[in-house]
């Protein structure tokens, strides 16, 4: 009986862990509310700030498997919790 209970606990923990999917914000607006469910390999939320000459500083948000390297005149922030790229 103890073995069965232990097996059920282990299976439950594994299934819960495999079922988790990160959610990130994906809109360019300053006060973003649009949520996107990331793919399994995407474990980070990203926010990139860049200078768009006519419009000023803009932000691009989304999901990523790895934190991208910043380009010239760009700032990149990565985080790993739901909707952390505000």
Curated annotation (Swiss-Prot):
Signal peptide positions (record): 1-21
CDD domains: TFP_snake_toxin (cd00206)
Transmembrane spans: none
Domain of life (superkingdom): Eukaryota
Alphabetical list of InterPro entries matching this protein: Snake_3FTx, Snake_toxin-like_sf, Snake_toxin_con_site, Toxin_cobra-type
Chief location of this protein within or outside the cell: secreted
Entry GO MF terms: acetylcholine receptor inhibitor activity; ion channel regulator activity; toxin activity
UniProt-recorded name of the protein: Neurotoxin 3FTx-8a
Family of the protein in this entry: Belongs to the three-finger toxin family. Ancestral subfamily. Orphan group II sub-subfamily.
Function: Binds with low affinity to muscular (alpha-1-beta-1-delta-epsilon/CHRNA1-CHRNB1-CHRND-CHRNE) and very low affinity to neuronal (alpha-7/CHRNA7) nicotinic acetylcholine receptor (nAChR).
S-S bridge residues: 24-45, 27-32, 38-63, 67-78, 79-84
Tissue expr: Expressed by the venom gland.
Keywords: Acetylcholine receptor inhibiting toxin, Disulfide bond, Ion channel impairing toxin, Neurotoxin, Postsynaptic neurotoxin, Secreted, Signal, Toxin
UniProt keyword annotation of Acetylation present: no
GO annotation, cellular component aspect: extracellular region
Organism annotation: Bungarus fasciatus
